Amino acid sequence: MSPIHPTAIIEEGVELGCDCTIHAHAVLRRGTVLGDGVKVHEFAVLGGDPQYLKFDPATRSGVRIGAGTVIREHVTINRSIHSGEATTVGARCFLMANVHLGHDCAVADDVVLANNVMLAGHVSVGSFTFVGGGAGIHQFCRVGESVMVSGLSRIALDLPPFVMVAERNEVIGLNLVGLKRRGFSREALRELKAAFRAVYFSGGNIRTVATSVLAAGEFHTTEARQFLEFFTAGKRGFARPRRAAADSGEGVSD
């Protein structure tokens, strides 16, 4: 049985998995679905109407939260603007206090969003990514897998997988510490370093360079190909390295 504080508000149509914990004054709106073991702390609001001026409140949409995710105080997760669809958060995520997820965000498994992170509508975040406190991410941006975003960053471009990013869309190298902790092989790391250099240090249009490198078939690890394939999609453009990093190769050395 899921312990639910008597002051929590859980609307009709909410679905709770086994062993969920709902703390005082949390609000779960109609269409919210929680997996097993989800913890929702005080004053969080899940499934509230999106902050979208043209939204029809009669739209039947929702929010889905994966098993084992922790949602701390005052987190807000808005429901989808589309009928039958949901804003999603994966399993084993940790959303710290005051995080905001706009409508139609898609957050994958094992993501950490630190205090006061703000994701605008339609942002996607890959698995094992960490976003530092106070960072803001523009609508429709894609954030790849295992990205490390520093606190107070302002992100308005797509962030490829496996990188570290700071300040205003500035890539500062590969997230090597995080990748090693995940057990990436030496070969995967070697190819990722080479792919990073090929895309960012060779000059020219990033999408064109990545597409050309992929077509050449020089990279064989799943990780390197995933990095390159990221640049073949998206509409917002891509974050680039700091000049200092580009000049010195910071973040991609052995």
Spans of features found by a protein language model:
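Terminal amphipathic alpha-helical/low-complexity segments used for targeting or macromolecular assembly
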Residues: 1, 6-7, 37, 43, ...
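Structural signal for interior beta-strand "rungs" in well-ordered beta-sheet cores
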Residues: 2-166, 170
